[in-house]
Design a protein with these regions (language model features):
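FAD-binding subdomain of flavoenzyme oxidoreductases
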Residues: 2-147
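Terminal amphipathic helices with adjacent charged low-complexity linkers/tails
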Residues: 144-167
Length: 167
């Protein structure tokens, strides 16, 4: 896999802008992405609802650099193993109680070359789930986001965002 070592204080947009130049993306867009840092995502074990496949930061962290009261812990990038506990996993979601995360090696993905946005009306939640399955099958699971919103929420969008059409 492709990976990058990243400092914990980088904000989501800055990280994606740096990756864009290399044709890569993290494909991790949680709701507070614009205003939060990588270290915070790891410390809180963040999950992004603006994603369809890689929804938790766990899916992206390959190794960590953490400062503890005992000193620096720098894990190595190693393949997944069933040979006992993984020390990195202890720090995911620890909220700073075990140490301060200073950096991480992150799993990256090729940036999509084509971007399409669709606003589709479906008759039921079951139909929306079927639609997502069809989209994922047609794109090789490359769809980066899929949201289901209620009619009430749609009415708010139509009332407050000019030039938005009712699907």
């Amino acid at each position: 896999s492709q990976a990058a070592r990243v400092q914990a204080g980088v904000l989501g947009p800055d990280l994606e802008n740096q990756l864009r130049a290399s044709g890569l993306t993290m494909r991790f867009f949680l709701q507070a992405w614009e205003f939060s840092s990588l270290g915070g995502w790891i410390a809180t074990r963040a999950a992004g609802h603006f994603a369809t496949v890689y929804t938790q930061i766990d899916d992206h962290v390959e190794s960590l650099r953490v400062v503890t009261p005992e000193g620096l812990i720098a894990s190595r990038r190693v393949p997944a193993s069933g040979a006992g506990p993984n020390p990195d996993r202890l720090f995911l979601g620890s909220e700073g109680t075990l140490g301060i995360i200073t950096g991480a090696a992150l799993r990256l993905f090729p940036r999509p070359t084509d971007v399409t946005t669709a606003f589709v009306a479906v008759p039921s939640v079951a139909a929306a789930i079927d639609l997502l399955s069809e989209i994922q099958a047609a794109t090789g699971e490359q769809a980066s986001a899929f949201e289901l919103i209620s009619r009430f929420a749609l009415e708010l969008v139509l009332d407050h965002i000019p030039n938005t059409r009712d699907p």
